[in-house]
Amino acid sequence: MTIRYPNGQVYRQPGPTKSKSSKFANVNFGDRGMSLEQEINDSNAYYLENNIAVIHKKPTPIQIVKVDYPKRSAAVIREAYFKQASTTDYNGVYRGKYLDFEAKETKNKTAFPLKNFHEHQIKHMRQCLAQSGICFVIIRFASLGRLFLLTASDLFTYWDHQGDGGRKSIPLTDIEHLAAELHYQINPRIPYLDALDHIIDETSSIH
């Protein structure tokens, strides 16, 4: 079956990553050829298996274009396209709270470009916040090997300012001040719920 992205490019299943032999003391848990998405998926699997949280990646909707019917009782999809995702990457429940978040990365070393986000994602997070959900973004500076968890409210400040003539990126220095830096470990690979604990506790104390 041929699956295509919205731009028509053919989707190809990524092959297995080759393991590299190294001493445990020199392992950088963020440098194993994994995508940020896979690292978060692995972390979510750990949280689920240990009854800590239930968080899943939302499936990307697919539009079926061509179907063959070699048998009356079976249909074979020959061609399909990934549709544009309408919301964010992940959602779930933790400590009785609804979570909704996006994961993005950049090769830029000094700022995070706001063009990595889409208007429909910002709108969706605003709607979730209005219903007392907890929304945030996990940002990775790939060239620096650094990870941050930034609340949606802080993201909105920069998103709204760009429409008023403000800069179209968030400086790394601002992210260092506003966001919680996440550090790789063995399990979970990205312990982002540790940072969320502080956000939930602060929110609970206000109410």
UniProtKB/Swiss-Prot annotation:
General function of this protein: Endonuclease that resolves Holliday junction intermediates in genetic recombination. Cleaves mobile four-strand junctions by introducing symmetrical nicks in paired strands. Promotes annealing of linear ssDNA with homologous dsDNA. Required for DNA repair, homologous recombination and chromosome segregation.
Binding site for Mg(2+): 87, 89, 102, 121
Reactions it catalyzes: Endonucleolytic cleavage at a junction such as a reciprocal single-stranded crossover between two homologous DNA duplexes (Holliday junction)
Domain of life: Bacteria
SUPFAM superfamilies in UniProt: Restriction endonuclease-like
Keyword Aminoacyl-tRNA synthetase among UniProt keywords: no
Cofactor(s) of this protein: Mg(2+)
Top-rank EC class of the record's enzyme: hydrolase
Any single GO CC term annotated in Swiss-Prot or TrEMBL for this entry: cytoplasm
Positions marked as site (Transition state stabilizer): 104
GO MF, one example: magnesium ion binding
Species per Swiss-Prot/TrEMBL record: Lactiplantibacillus plantarum (strain ATCC BAA-793 / NCIMB 8826 / WCFS1) (Lactobacillus plantarum)
Gene Ontology annotations of biological process type: chromosome segregation; DNA recombination; DNA repair
Protein name: Holliday junction resolvase RecU
Annotated family: Belongs to the RecU family.
InterPro entries for this protein: Resolv_RecU, Restrct_endonuc-II-like, tRNA_endonuc-like_dom_sf
Keyword annotations from UniProtKB, A to Z: Cytoplasm, DNA damage, DNA recombination, DNA repair, Endonuclease, Hydrolase, Magnesium, Metal-binding, Nuclease
Region of interest: Disordered: 1-21
Name of a matching Pfam family: RecU
Main location: cytoplasm
Gene: recU
The protein's Enzyme Commission number: 3.1.21.10
Subcellular location: Cytoplasm
Cofactor note (record): Binds 1 Mg(2+) ion per subunit.
